[in-house]
């Protein structure tokens, strides 16, 4: 899909946050400071401890044998997670620890390179691949306290080869191996989600065609005034599934919006965080929700995440699945649309909660 014309977008000066903390460690530029209403209500520390344990955890080893009680119990947990939270963590997912640690190490090495080296792979205004900040469309738009490096991975035609770095030397090999593992995980998860919706297990894979997969590495440096900034603006994802890997010993940074309150999600060792994207919300006719989420920063600790977005091929027409629509009891909530058109719409606007999904809603 073609990016927006670069000449039509004026984004102003975008400071690199890693360079900021080197030169002015105790100063937060005005363009990063959020209005008080943007910071929202965060669940209290007492409730946070309780809610950490309410974030659903799905044990994928229990879904390997479909004929036992564990399977049906875990499918029920998965259904409730998708319906009530839109987020869950998966354990025993089958991806080797060495694969996970290697991509973390490579990503860390990339962000540690000199700025001049990273600037060889720029994220141009109106695009979402390369190094920099995405979703910036005006000179007065507030910035996130984050550096990003994003790449299209699969199918090959969505890649921009000029943006795949030559350093670190094993970057491409590591990302290829990791992405293959995550792709297989997404296929498995979609089978289980289909079963949880009462669909045949291959329903999503048959409909998606050659699925689109992209990766974004996010680096959140420490911030001297974390209460004034956001690491990543509130948004839902345009994907079908999103897989979040948080670096080892990561501080709490992800927050999800539940009952109008921001709930921190505590990382579990060797777990991956999965969230439902807008595409699954549409396909399930709103039964499973894509949930607004954001990232916050820490005064003392850095945070590194690796995010994979998995979605249907751009040529696929998306609409609520007929099995999940009933004219009387559950009428169609979303119109039919081309997934490529929605993807273009999503990346052509700044992150604003769930506003992007208005593109597909049927307004009564």
UniProtKB/Swiss-Prot annotation:
Binds 1 Fe(2+) ion per subunit. Disruption phenotype: Increased shoot branching associated with an accumulation of carlactone (CL) and methyl carlactonoate (MeCLA) as well as reduced responses to these compounds, substrate and product of MAX1, respectively. Accumulation of carlactone (CL), carlactonoate (CLA) and methyl carlactonoate (MeCLA), 16-hydroxycarlactone (16-HO-CL), hydroxycarlactonoates 3-HO-CLA, 4-HO-CLA and 16-HO-CLA, as well as methyl 4-hydroxycarlactonoate (4-HO-MeCLA) and methyl 16-hydroxycarlactonoate (16-HO-MeCLA), compounds related to (11R)-hydroxymethyl carlactonoate (1'-HO-MeCLA). Its cofactor is Fe(2+); L-ascorbate. Keywords: Cytoplasm, Dioxygenase, Iron, Metal-binding, Oxidoreductase. Residues 203-312 form the Fe2OG dioxygenase domain. This is Protein LATERAL BRANCHING OXIDOREDUCTASE 1. It is an enzyme of class 1 (oxidoreductase). It catalyses: (11R)-methyl carlactonoate + 2-oxoglutarate + O2 = (11R)-hydroxymethyl carlactonoate + succinate + CO2. Monomer. One of its GO terms (cellular component) is cytoplasm. Its EC number is 1.14.11.-. Expressed in the vasculature throughout the plant and in the buds and root tips. 2-oxoglutarate binds at residue 303. The gene is LBO1. The keyword Oxidoreductase applies. InterPro entries: DIOX_N (IPR026992), IPNS-like_FE2OG_OXY (IPR044861), IPNS-like_sf (IPR027443), Oxoglu/Fe-dep_dioxygenase_dom (IPR005123), Plant_2OG-oxidoreductases (IPR050295). It is found in: Cytoplasm. The branching phenotypes of the lbo mutant can be rescued by exogenous treatment with the synthetic strigolactone analog GR24. However, the lbo and lbo max4 mutants do not respond to carlactone (CL). PROSITE patterns: FE2OG_OXY. The keyword NAD does not apply. It comes from the Eukaryota. Gene3D superfamilies: B-lactam Antibiotic, Isopenicillin N Synthase, Chain. Oxoglutarate-dependent dioxygenase involved in the biosynthesis of strigolactone natural products, bioactive compounds promoting plant fitness and soil microbe interactions, but preventing shoot branching. Catalyzes the hydroxylation of (11R)-methyl carlactonoate (MeCLA) to produce (11R)-hydroxymethyl carlactonoate (1'-HO-MeCLA) in final stages of strigolactone biosynthesis, downstream of MAX1 and CLAMT.
């Amino acid at each position: 899909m073609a990016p927006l014309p670069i000449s039509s977008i004026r984004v102003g000066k975008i400071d690199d946050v890693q360079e900021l903390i080197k030169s002015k460690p105790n100063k937060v530029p005005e363009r990063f400071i959020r209005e008080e209403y943007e910071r929202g209500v965060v669940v209290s520390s007492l409730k946070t401890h309780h809610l950490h344990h309410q974030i659903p955890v799905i044990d994928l080893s229990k879904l390997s044998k479909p004929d036992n009680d564990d399977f049906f119990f875990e499918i029920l947990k998965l259904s409730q997670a998708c319906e009530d939270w839109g987020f869950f963590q998966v354990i025993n997912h089958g991806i080797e620890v060495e694969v996970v640690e290697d991509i973390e190490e490579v990503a860390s090495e990339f962000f540690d390179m000199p700025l001049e080296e990273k600037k060889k792979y720029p994220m141009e205004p109106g695009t979402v691949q390369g190094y920099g900040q995405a979703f910036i469309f005006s000179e007065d738009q507030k910035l996130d306290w984050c550096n990003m490096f994003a790449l299209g991975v699969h199918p090959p035609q969505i890649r921009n080869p000029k943006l795949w770095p030559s350093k670190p030397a094993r970057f491409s090999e590591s990302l290829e191996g990791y992405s293959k593992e995550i792709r297989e995980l997404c296929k498995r998860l979609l089978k289980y989600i289909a079963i949880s919706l009462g669909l045949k297990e291959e329903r999503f894979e048959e409909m998606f065609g050659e699925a689109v997969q992209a990766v974004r590495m996010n680096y959140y440096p420490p911030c001297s005034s974390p209460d004034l900034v956001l690491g990543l603006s509130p948004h839902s994802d345009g994907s079908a599934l999103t897989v979040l890997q948080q670096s080892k010993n990561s501080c709490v940074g992800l927050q999800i919006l539940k009952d109008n309150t921001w709930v921190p999600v505590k990382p579990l060792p060797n777990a991956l965080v999965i969230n439902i994207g807008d595409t699954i919300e549409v396909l399930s006719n709103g039964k499973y929700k894509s949930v607004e989420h954001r990232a916050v920063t820490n005064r003392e600790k850095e945070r590194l995440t690796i995010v994979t977005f998995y979605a249907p091929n751009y040529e696929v027409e998306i609409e609520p699945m007929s099995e999940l629509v009933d004219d009387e009891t559950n009428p169609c909530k979303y119109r039919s649309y081309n997934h490529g058109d929605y993807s273009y719409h999503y990346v052509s606007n700044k992150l604003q909660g769930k506003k992007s999904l208005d593109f597909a809603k049927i307004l009564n």
